[in-house]
Each structure stands twice: as C-alpha cells, then as structure tokens.
From Swiss-Prot:
Pfam families for this protein: HSP70 (PF00012)
Primary role: Acts as a chaperone.
Keyword presence, Metal-binding: no
Keywords, in A-Z order: ATP-binding, Chaperone, Nucleotide-binding, Phosphoprotein, Stress response
Family as reported in the entry's similarity comment: Belongs to the heat shock protein 70 family.
PTM annotation (Phosphothreonine): residues: T198
Region (Disordered): 600-634
GO molecular function: ATP binding; ATP-dependent protein folding chaperone; unfolded protein binding
Protein known as: Chaperone protein DnaK
InterPro entries: ATPase_NBD, Chaperone_DnaK, Heat_shock_70_CS, HSP70_C_sf, HSP70_peptide-bd_sf, Hsp_70_fam
C-alpha cells in the first residue's frame, strides 16, 4: 500500500516524515540532513538547484536564488507585505497578469506556488528514495493564520509537485499531534510556534486521543527572517560608520551579510558572544575592505526585542478567545527554530508563568505531526481525532452595509451554517450575495472574498422571498458559499478562489482595527440598525396610508404624514437618538391611526397583509436585476 507522507513546508527549512507502523520517522535527504533549506536557485546554464546546493551558491548568485518564498504565496503584488518583502530580498518580485506577486529570473516568471512546488518535489523524492516506492499523496502544513488564498496556493504547489494533498493542516496543530501522541491523560496546551517567517499560537485541549483546538492567533510576517534582517541592517550600519561605504546597495555583500547574520543568530543561542568576520566584503579606491565585529547575545537581544514582544499580544488574544488564563495552561510546547533563542524562551516563560516544554525537536515536530495526520487518514493511526478551527469570522453584507456573521472565528471545522435572508425591495427578482471575512461590524471594513448573483426570484413584496445562504468550510479551511431561493430551489454557489484570498496585512488590519475602533463600530452599527428600523416603519406606515386612505380622517392622515416626513428628515443624519425619537413618534401616530380605524368600525373583515415581514428574516442589501439585466441599487 502506497504511503502518505507528511511535509512541513517551512519558510526557512522544510522537513518530511512518514509513519512506520505507529511510529513517525523523519526522513534524511540526499545530503544526509533531516531538514532541507527552502531555497530554489537557477544557475547560469539554467540548471535548477533545490535545498543545500541552492543555499551554498546563494552568495555568488543572489538575484536567481529564491528564499523565504512562503512569504509571497497567495499574496497579491499590491499587498503591503509584498512591498515590505521587496526591500528585504535580492531577487526580483513582479506583478503577474492576475495581480499576484510572482518572481523572475533570467526573464522567466515563476509563481510562489511553482517555487514551493520545487521544494515539495525535493521532499517527495527524499521520501521515495527512503521508501523505495512512488509517493503520490501528502499532508502539508501551513501556518494556522494562513488565509484562504494562501491555503489554496499551497494546495496548488502540491499539485504542481505531483502530489495529491489529502489535507492542509495547521502547523501548531500538527506539533500538538506529535507532542500528544503518546501522552496519557487530559490537559490544555499552548503551542508557541516561531519559525523562519511566521508566528502562530494555538490553544488545544488534549485527552483520550482527541485534539481540539480552542483558539488560534498569529502573524504570518514575523519570524527568523526578520531577526536576520535586523542583524544585517546593524552590520551594514556599523560598517558604514567605520568605512563610509553603504553595503545595502551591494546585493552580493548583502547576501554575505545575511549568511553571516543567520550563522551568528544560531551561535548566540548557545554562546554569549560571537565574532563576525567577512574578509573582502567590498572595496574602494584605497583597496579591499573587511568586516570584523564582535557581537554579544545581549546586543542581539536588544536589536530584536520588539520582534519578540510582538508575539505576546497574539498569545493574549488566543487565551482570551479560548476563555482561559495563563495559569490554566498545563504545558507550553515550543515549535520553530527561533524558539531556541534564550530570550524567546524567557518571554514565553514570563507570559505563561511556567517553564516551556523542550522535549520536542522544534525543527521536526511539525513534519512528525503531519505524518501522524497522514497515518490517521490512511488508517494506520487509530483513535486520534483532530478538531481544528477557522481563524476569522465569515459572513455576508446585509441592509445598510452591515456585516452579518454566519461563522464566528475559532469555530471548529469542518462546519456548515445556513441562515435565511430576504429582499430589500418589492418585486425584487435578483440578489447579489457579497461574501466577507473579518471582525469589523461594517462589511466595508472587512475583506471582500467574492460575490455572486442569484436570479429568477419570483416577484413578491419585500421580506417575503426566503433566500437561504449557506457557508461550508472544509477540513482544509477552504470556503464554499451557496445561496438558494427556497420557493424555486434555484441555487448559485461560489468557491473562494486564490485570487480573492486575504493578505496578511488585511488579516492583521481587521483584527487590530476591530479592537481600536470597537466603540466606533458599535456607534455605526447602532446608526444603521436605527435607520433600518425607521425605514421599515416608514414603509409600513406609507403602505397603511395607501390601503386605508378612504377609511381614516384627514386629521389622522395628516398626523401620520407629518410623522413620516419627520422620520425621513433625520434619516440621512448621524444622530441615532434623533432617529429613534422620530421613529417612536411615528410608531405612536401609526397606533392612533389603527385605533381610529377600529373605532370607526371597518365594514370588511381583517385585511390581508401580503407583504408582512417576518421577525426571523433579515433584510439583505441586495440589488435588483431588471429585464435589461442592468442592476439597480437596492
């Protein structure tokens, strides 16, 4: 039976593992190493190098050596994080025809999925050489905070590499699987995962083979690469002070600085001081220049302290979302190479109030967890159930631009949720479903994932048609949205495509803005709610005036018309209290009209309210499609 492999596709290094019976095994590559640098290079004669061979020649070939490509996967060219990356890497990042960020070497363009596929192919070949048989299926890990576009792009990379990706699994969850596989008893663990390019924290409850993620948070543009950049900038600045030459303008020198910075960073995890020695780093009219500098651990920690502190807030949010305190965490598991740094361990210990668990290899534990999940899918690993979550809320835009959530963040996946909405106008025959993701109260402040139309709705008074909107998130965290007219059973659906995915900048902005603007959001939500209620009352009152025009006195009619005009007069304003007050006046006038009608005694029986709105139906901000297929605003 063919084996399913587990792959940790990392920013800096990648790793592959497989289950041997009930035991996961990390597979060594052709160079004899258990991890492979996530680097792809193209030589002068067009040869493609992957892993250690690519890394070895990076200093002399910086413009055709692609590293940290994971930071670009699933991102658009205009993404702020892409712009940031452009200033950090020596290779060329370009705008693809679809607006995505791609890379270029020797006039050839490559998508990040393609470059990632070359790394995955190396992992595949490593596994095949060890197993002695072809491998066609894999479980691949991604940061827990990866968005839909990034997950889709990772699946694409697997497909390009010739792998059927059976499951996309979150890295902290994979680490928890590896950690908890042979543990007895129940407990709550926090997985602190600071890798080469991303940071994640997940809170999980483990017991009796069940791994349930309670919450997750993170930053997909924070990791070891940023620590390297800080050190490179420091070295370049020190060299400029001493020699008056800016090494930042020399790509070859920058690549040597990066290599030296990475080496120094690693050495300072075990030593308190290291020496950086780069002879012939550059030259000027006076001759060759050399860079020699002693770097202490304390100085390095000072350079990157703010980066380490940036990991604390996501930890705090994850605990809050899980409804737990730091004291309720039984164990903190460290994942990712950067967690070897003593200062990182110190910050983790300070926040959680306990010594972090160091019993797992931070470079290998994610791949091991992926192999365990592969074993579960293949049936080799029994009695293990994994329950993961979606990192952000999902919903649609409804009347007044409000974001109506169907699925809240940190909901266990796979999940499916339906809600019934209705039309905003009489005789509306089509609606536009606009799908958003985020945490803000107003749809416009969140990320538009996509939109689609549901047409052919039978004409009816507003509020009568029933449109069922269903969100379906699969175990990979990939979203499907369906809308169905319950009267005709007509249905439309959209699968959120990679081009419509979220950027990391968007995710961070959504969550941070949600906190900063919480009060503002609440005020705007109250205003929209008040307007919606007022407009509904105006609609109802005007309808009553039309239907019972000949059955009420001129005085009652004038009073109601005045109340309607009064409400309309404040609707465009921003004063919530004024809208509520005028709406209350209109409600009183409507009641008096009703009382007057009953006192007068209606000749006919009870009137049929053909367009009565149902309490459990939410008005949606949809658009009407006329006979000429041109949409009008609702």
């Amino acid at each position: 039976m063919a084996k399913v492999i587990g792959i940790d596709l990392g920013t800096t290094n990648s790793c592959v593992a497989v289950m041997e019976g009930t035991t996961p095994k990390v597979i060594e590559n052709a160079e004899g190493a258990r991890t492979t640098p996530s680097i792809v290079a193209f030589t002068d004669d067009g040869e493609r190098l992957v892993g250690q061979p690519a890394k070895r020649q990076s200093v002399t070939n910086p413009e055709r050596t692609f590293f940290a490509i994971k930071r670009l996967i699933g991102r658009t060219y205009d993404d702020p994080m892409t712009k940031k990356d452009m200033g950090l890497v020596p290779y060329k990042i370009i705008r693809a025809s679809n607006g995505d960020a791609w890379v270029e070497a020797d006039g050839k363009q490559y998508s990040p999925s393609q470059i990632s596929a070359f790394i995955l192919q190396k992992m595949k070949e490593t596994a095949e050489a060890y197993l002695g048989q072809p491998v066609s299926q894999a479980v691949i890990t991604v940061p827990a905070y990866f968005n839909d576009a990034q997950r889709q792009a990772t699946k694409d990379a697997g497909k390009i590499a010739g792998l059927e990706v059976l499951r996309i699994i979150n890295e902290p969850t994979a680490a928890a699987l590896a950690y908890g596989l042979d543990k007895k008893g129940a407990g709550v663990i926090a997985v602190y995962d600071l890798g080469g390019g991303t940071f994640d924290v997940s809170i999980l409850e483990i017991g009796d083979g069940v791994f349930e993620v309670k919450s997750t948070n993170g930053d997909t543009f924070l990791g070891g690469e940023d620590f390297d950049v800080r050190l490179v900038e420091y070295l370049a600045d020190e060299f400029k002070k001493e020699n008056g030459i800016d090494l930042k303008k020399d790509k070859l020198a920058l690549q040597r600085l990066k290599e030296a910075a990475e080496k120094a960073k690693i050495e300072l995890s075990s030593a308190t001081q290291t020496e950086i020695n780069l002879p012939y780093i550059t030259a000027d009219a006076t001759g060759p220049k050399h860079l020699t500098l002693k770097l202490t651990r304390a100085k390095f920690e000072a350079l990157v302290d703010d980066l380490i502190q940036k990991t604390v807030e996501p930890c705090r949010k994850a605990l809050k979302d899980a409804g737990l305190t730091a004291g309720e965490i039984n164990e903190v598991v460290l994942v990712g190479g950067m967690t070897r740094m003593p200062k990182v361990q110190e910050v983790v210990k300070s926040f959680f109030g306990k010594e972090p668990h160091k019993g797992v290899n931070p470079d290998e534990v994610v791949a091991i967890g992926a192999a365990v999940q592969a074993g579960v899918l293949q049936g080799d690993v029994k009695d293990v159930l994994l329950l993961d979550v979606t990192p952000l809320s999902l919903g649609i835009e409804t009347l007044g631009g409000v974001f109506t959530r169907l699925i809240d963040r940190n909901t266990t996946i796979p999940t499916k949720k339906s809600q019934v909405f209705s039309t905003a106008e009489d005789n509306q025959t089509a609606v536009t479903i606009r799908v958003f993701q985020g945490e803000r109260e107003m749809a416009a402040d969140n990320k538009l994932l996509g939109q689609f139309d549901l047409v052919g709705i039978p004409g009816a008074p507003r509020g009568v048609p029933q449109i069922e909107v269903t969100f379906d998130i699969d175990a990979n965290g990939i979203v499907n949205v369906t809308a169905k007219d319950k009267a005709t059973n007509k249905e439309q659906q959209i699968r959120i495509q990679a081009s419509g995915g979220l950027s990391e900048g968007d995710i961070d902005k959504m969550v941070k803005d949600a906190e900063v603007h919480a009060a503002e959001d609440k005020k705007r939500r109250e205003l929209v709610d008040a307007r919606n209620q007022a407009e509904a009352m105006v609609h109802s009152a005007e309808k009553s005036l039309t239907e019972f025009a000949g059955k009420v006195s001129d005085a009652d009619k004038s009073a109601l018309e005045a109340a309607i005009a009064s409400v309309k007069g404040v609707l465009e304003g921003e004063d919530v209290e004024a809208i509520k007050a005028r709406s209350n006046d209109l409600a009183q006038a409507s009641m008096k009209l009703g009382e007057a009608m009953y006192k007068a005694g209606a000749e006919a029986g009870p009137q049929e309210g053909g367009g009565a709105e149902k309490d459990d139906v939410i008005d949606a901000d949809f658009k009407e499609v006329g006979p000429d297929d041109k949409k009008k605003s609702a």
